[in-house]
Swiss-Prot record:
This is tRNA modification GTPase MnmE. Binds 1 potassium ion per subunit. It comes from Borrelia duttonii (strain Ly). NCBIfam families: mnmE_trmE_thdF, small_GTP. InterPro entries: G_TrmE, GTP-bd, GTP-bd_TrmE_N, GTPase_MnmE, MnmE_dom2, MnmE_helical, P-loop_NTPase, Small_GTP-bd. It comes from the Bacteria.
């Protein structure tokens, strides 16, 4: 049965991760949540008589043997002034794994059932405590991996997206009102002037929201950064430097990295998925050959490529092949490493020559850290267009569901403008206007189906 029809059940779930910790939070909600929980609390009358938004100290007890299970602090909320709009109990207990299991078992014994993923937030939505844009923002907030994504989710949780959609809806309904006035007072002597500017404004707002989706997805997925180059040029040293930890083995032996190593780091609030790849060279080692094939595949799919060159050594045939193939590729930054060593004159002259002077290059030393700030500046400039333009938008869309609905609304607006241009009967335009409003209502949840809600909330984590 759909969770929409089980909202009177008393539910319980662990709201914090299930591992040993100082504290954990177990949350519950339901019509009889306080009454049922009181049966396993050391002072039941105190809870039954307590007002909402109060905190109580006591013990979780086995209601049959009166054995103390844990010393706890209980937050009590009474309907309708709670997250779910129902009576709710949140228990702060010690984060012992066996203790958590035993406490939840006793919740189940007194009549609670385990909550399904997202069920607390679903109940909050059904109680009118939040709209769907805020519900989705909660999920985005929990799963945020970087400061920028986190900030965007907080912005939507504060109601920015709902307000934007609501404003567009009001503009479109104002357009409908204007048509109605013209129809009421239209005479043969008066030419009806449709306020197309209102629809054009809505079209522009929808375009911006749809455009923001690509930026949001890039921020969530992060930058795929591939470190490529010949063997022993310092790729693994650069990998460790970017991560600020020793993840890759650094050795003077060629071919130490035989397959790629992947890790993530955050830079300026943006997620980077960085790959340290096998050095490009001719080799008879089968495993290393596979690593090089994978390296080439990663290079083709990368958002950014740092091709590392050893300025103290000669350029290899693989270096020259790569430079020729990727010299006009805007994703590539040639990182000229080992400037702290005596430099190879031929290599230096090559990068100073007219043929390659236009290459995007930066000189560094992973050993002395020379040029590292310049490298960071180059990273900023390389990702600025695609990953650092969130300030261009007052609201950013990151939900696929929202993006698809916005595209539907935009298509309907385009169709509406076409009908206006064709002088379609004004009373017929009202049907199209209402269709746009309904689609926008699906974004906020004012118009939606049970199946949509079930599918959306099942992707939430337990306890939320």
């Amino acid at each position: 049965m759909s969770r929409l029809f089980q909202k009177e059940d008393d539910i319980v779930a662990l709201a914090t991760p299930f591992f040993s910790s100082a504290l954990c939070v177990i949350r519950s909600s339901g019509v009889s949540a306080i009454e049922k929980f009181s049966k396993m609390f050391s002072d039941p009358s105190k809870l039954l008589e307590a007002s909402g938004h109060t905190i109580h100290y006591g013990y979780i007890l086995d209601n049959e043997t009166k054995e103390k299970l844990d010393e706890v602090v209980v937050c009590l909320y009474r309907a309708p002034k709670s997250f779910t709009g129902q009576d709710s109990i949140e228990v702060m207990a010690h984060g012992s794994l066996i203790g958590i299991r035993r406490i939840i078992d006793f919740f189940l014994k007194v009549g609670f059932r385990m909550a399904e993923p997202g069920e607390f937030t679903l109940r909050s939505f059904l109680a009118g405590k939040l709209d769907l844009t805020k519900a989705e923002a909660i999920n985005e907030l929990i799963s945020a991996k970087t400061r920028q994504v986190h900030a965007l989710a907080v912005n939507k949780l504060s109601g920015s997206l709902f307000d934007k959609i609501d404003l567009i809806k009001k503009d479109i309904l104002n357009f409908l009102s204007a048509i109605s006035v013209y129809l009421d007072y239209e005479t043969d002597d008066n030419e009806v002037v449709i306020p197309v500017d209102i629809i054009l404004k809505s079209k522009s707002e929808l375009e911006r929201l749809i455009d923001s989706y690509d930026t949001a997805r890039k921020l969530e997925n992060g930058v795929t950064l591939v470190l490529a180059g010949s063997v022993n040029v310092g790729k693994s040293s650069l990998f460790n430097l970017l991560l600020k930890e020793d993840r890759a083995i650094v050795s003077s032996y060629a071919g130490t990295t035989r397959d790629y190593i992947q890790a993530s780091f955050e830079f300026d609030g943006i997620l980077f998925n960085v790959f340290d790849t096998a050095g490009l060279r001719e080799t008879s080692d089968f495993v290393e050959q596979l690593g090089i094939v994978r390296s080439n595949s990663l290079i083709k799919e990368a958002s950014l490529i740092f091709y590392v060159v050893d300025l103290s050594g000669k350029l290899t045939d693989d270096d020259l092949k790569f430079i020729d193939a990727y010299k006009e590729d805007s994703r590539v930054l040639f990182v000229l490493n080992k400037v702290d060593l005596e430099q190879n004159n031929q290599t230096v002259e090559f990068f100073n020559s007219n043929n390659v002077v236009s290459l995007n290059t930066v000189k560094i030393s992973t050993k002395t850290l020379f040029g590292i700030n310049s490298l960071y500046d180059r990273i900023r400039s390389l990702i600025a267009v695609d990953y650092m333009k969130t300030s261009d938008y007052d609201v950013v869309i990151s939900s696929t569901r929202q993006a698809e609905l916005l595209k539907r609304a935009y298509a309907l607006i385009i169709e509406l403008l076409s009908k206006i241009e064709q002088n379609i009967s004004y009373d017929m335009l009202a049907f199209d206007v209402y269709e746009v409003v309904n689609v926008l209502g699906e974004i906020t949840g004012e118009v939606t189906s049970d199946d949509v809600l079930d599918n959306m909330f099942k992707n939430f984590c337990l306890g939320k």
